[in-house]
Amino acid sequence: MNLQVDHIRVDFIIGSRRISNFCWAFILLFGALGFFFVGFSSYLQKDLIPFLSAEQILFIPQGIVMCFYGIAGLFISFYLWCTICWNVGSGYNKFDKQKGIFSIFRWGFPGKNRRIFIQFLIKDIQSIRMEVQEGFLSRRVLYIKIKGQPDIPLSRIEEYFTLREMEDKAAELARFLKVSIEGI
């Protein structure tokens, strides 16, 4: 989602609250609980969940391993749910022509550096760069080139579904900033 007025443009960045993250968090949570309960059921020699039978599973070694995998999966699921709740990675890119400032804001993990805020001068922006790698794991990233700085990614790897969307976004931004486009 973009917001553009005469001299100000704001590009909002979706963080970790994506449908894919919700799906993975649910899959991991239920899978890990299933593993843990089957492993623990093999220890008790009693089915804790009626449709997950543990009668044929010996506690040592299979039950212990299933409990371990279940606990590990619960930790990973907890991590995913925390990033979703904190909305890590969300924020905005703000281009203010009146003040001549380009700002990047992102939410991070809790702590003293939770708010990540970086500013650059718009006059130092040299160009917009597109990086495209096609194939099985395609990668499409939009960068901004600034004098004396490494290229700064403006988008996440999975943000653009098509090359056309990426080209349109790069052209819009380059037109607004009056800079050139590199890549492709």
UniProtKB/Swiss-Prot annotation:
Seems to be required for the assembly of the photosystem I complex. InterPro entries: PSI_Ycf4_assembly. One of its GO terms (cellular component) is photosystem I. The keyword Cell membrane does not apply. It holds the Pfam family Ycf4. The chain crosses the membrane at residues 21-43, 58-80. Belongs to the Ycf4 family. It is a multi-pass membrane protein. One of its GO terms (biological process) is photosynthesis. It comes from Marchantia polymorpha (Common liverwort). Keywords: Chloroplast, Membrane, Photosynthesis, Plastid, Thylakoid, Transmembrane, Transmembrane helix. This is Photosystem I assembly protein Ycf4. It is found in: Plastid, Chloroplast thylakoid membrane. The keyword Transmembrane applies. The gene is ycf4.
